[in-house]
Amino acid sequence: MGRIAALTRNPVMIALVAMLAIAGCASKKTPNNAADLGLNGAGAATPGSAQDFTVNIGDRIFFDTDSSSIRADAQTTLARQAQWLNQYKQYAIVVEGHADERGTREYNLALGARRAAAARDFLVSKGVASSRLKTISYGKERPVAVCDDISCWSQNRRAVTTLSGAGS
Amino acid sequence: MRSFLKPLLTIAAMALGMAAVVPMPAWALVELNVNKGNVEPLPIAITDFQGGDALGAQISQIVTADLKRSGLFAPIDKSAFIEKITNPDAAPRFDDWKVINAQALVTGSVSKEADGRIRAQYRLWDTFAGQQMAGEQFFANDANQRRVAHIIADAIYERLTGEKGYFDTRVVFIDESGAKNARKKRLAIMDQDGANVRYLSDGRSIVLTPRFSPNRQEITYMSYESGQPRVYLLQIETGQRELVGNFPGMTFAPRFSPDGQKVIMSLLRDDGNSNIFAMDLRSRSTTRLTNSTAIDTSPSYSPDGSKVVFTSDRGGRAQIYVMGADGSGQTRISFGDGVYSTPVWSPRGDLIAFTKQTGGEFQIGVMKTDGSGERILSSGFQQEGPTWAPNGRVLMFFRDSNGGPKLVSVDLTGRNEQPIPTSNFASDPAWSPLLE
């Protein structure tokens, strides 16, 4: 507990710990974060690579319960994503929308779709060409965190920006 | 005679002559009243069917399990039986059954015909009136042994309660296996008691929300197989599949209309909201029923096809709304404290089942079609997705606990909850109509 208390004084460290925690839970099938890509942390990625995007920019944003509003922290992440995507235009982009398990299956498919659309619209507002962007909703069918409490649900309420098409 | 599976065509029924000549009174021994306090299950003795080696005992066992699970019957332990039935066609010694408080007695026999078919017959006796209440015989091929038992259980249920049974039915569902963050989901079908599981998809893509066609031959469901999640139709016997409509965005939450001619579903708009459409399966024409900047989903027709109940968050959080089948007169009907979703209209037309989230719990409940008379039948940490038995007396849903979802049934009193045995995790059950 002492260690966590120490970490909380350093916001940068919190962000890193949070990211690693998420990476540890992620599905091995969809490499969209540092651990899945076999990286141990920031700095190892080639600028402009998918790894660079995931590790240094941050590929996901989180939402409040039953909400698709882009929070202030998410706006910062998405703005960073937009800047990077506008620099590396070779990528096509799929924004995945996800929900936590605290909703019914069909409603959560709709909620995930709305979250993906909200993230997409934000990226478009920051200059990313809408022709590069697609969305898909996974509802609550692809959780990255699997515990039965708030700490997991908050990680599962997410929109993940994934890169496809030409890449390095 | 229409049938669900080709081999079932050979099931044929005929009434057996009454062993007693007294005209049969048309009363029911069991009263179905969901508003009554404790329903006392009717003590019933179900003897092993004579003949057929182990088959006779097996049929008796299936009939016993069906009736017991309904919560309306209390089958008496065989070790308490005094009379050993040797001739199931002869009147039993009623006093021997009355003394162990068997209000009803089932006798029967099973035999092989020369053509290889099974002949099964049963008689239902009212022990206190001292007369036969019902008797029928059935012919079926080997593959339908269990169905014969379910049909007999339905006949007994109907004779004793005055309501149609629901045992000769199937359930389509999603079989789930593997870790929670890498769950394999397969379409599957089984008998309502969990027997005869058959898989209808290979698990390579996510499949969700299968729903039965009223003709029992098809299901509509949602699959990610093309990359984009879409609604499909599947012919259960042939395995033939087709996409329902060719829409630009995700289609989901499908259900058939009661005449089987339409599929109603949600279609994702480009702005991220979802609206409800109906598609005519013959003409392929689509009709938009809602047009709101909200989530409109989980549509379900009333059994006469004139109305649709659905979920919408147009008022802020998800609630239940009813509209005409043409989209007219959209009216909110749920006003309780909580979030309401997955409304499903009862096949009897009188009630709407739903999932409600309140106070950190998920509840399965029913309300009248105007939203009044809400009753919660089951509460839990995580449970959802009710489906109606064809007689409108029992619901099945799925409950997530101990690492994954399992199927559970509950009757309208809320007092009789039963697990449905499945070898893997299971979700999204949809109950078939009675088979034919």
UniProtKB/Swiss-Prot annotation, chain A:
GO terms for biological process: cell division. Residues 50-167 form the OmpA-like domain. It is found in: Cell outer membrane. It is a lipid-anchor. The keyword Cell inner membrane does not apply. InterPro entries: Bact_OuterMem_StrucFunc (IPR050330), OMP_bac (IPR006664), OmpA-like (IPR006665), OMPA-like_CS (IPR006690), OmpA-like_sf (IPR036737), Pal (IPR039001), Pal_lipo_C (IPR014169). It comes from the Bacteria. Keywords: Cell cycle, Cell division, Cell outer membrane, Lipoprotein, Membrane, Palmitate, Signal. GO terms for cellular component: cell outer membrane. Residues 1-24 form the signal peptide. The keyword Membrane applies. Belongs to the Pal lipoprotein family. PANTHER family: LIPOPROTEIN YIAD-RELATED (PTHR30329:SF21), STATOR ELEMENT OF FLAGELLAR MOTOR COMPLEX (PTHR30329). The Tol-Pal system is composed of five core proteins: the inner membrane proteins TolA, TolQ and TolR, the periplasmic protein TolB and the outer membrane protein Pal. They form a network linking the inner and outer membranes and the peptidoglycan layer. Part of the Tol-Pal system, which plays a role in outer membrane invagination during cell division and is important for maintaining outer membrane integrity. This is Peptidoglycan-associated lipoprotein.
